[in-house]
Amino acid sequence: MITIDIVIGNICSLLAMITDSISSSQKTTKGVLLVQSISQFIYGFGTLLLKGYSGAVQNAVSILRNFVAIKQIESKVLEWALVLMGVVLGVYFNNLGLIGYLPVVANFQYTLAIFKFKDNERAVKISFAICIGLFTVFNVAILNFVGACSNFVVTVATVIMLIKKK
């Protein structure tokens, strides 16, 4: 049965997608991160409505990570603290069993890839495809159809690009 929370959660995903597209038109990294933070807030709100708490926690940690980047705070300790926070809070607030771990694993592996392979575009893109693929499954499970469709399209596009650029 479609409830008001499902409708509003999906509308939030649509608004967040629009905000994500606006972020790409920003002229500065600070502008991109600020608009992406707004997007993460909207995604997080929608994910909360859809009762995907471990995913909402990942959105909140992403906002904190962007804030640290906007303030240009360079600290490996802080970066790893944010990774640890995402894992611990994601596990703690997981209410969906194995499915609830998908956003935690997705963000964890993607963050590690960025730390370890930041100069290897292909490795980061492979990790991104895995991340978005995991979020596709999670979004289906929480009935976030808008998010699942957009994640699926991005995953397929990324995989096709990776295959073509072998």
Where are these regions (language model features)?
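Alpha-helical membrane-protein topology signature
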Residues: 1-166
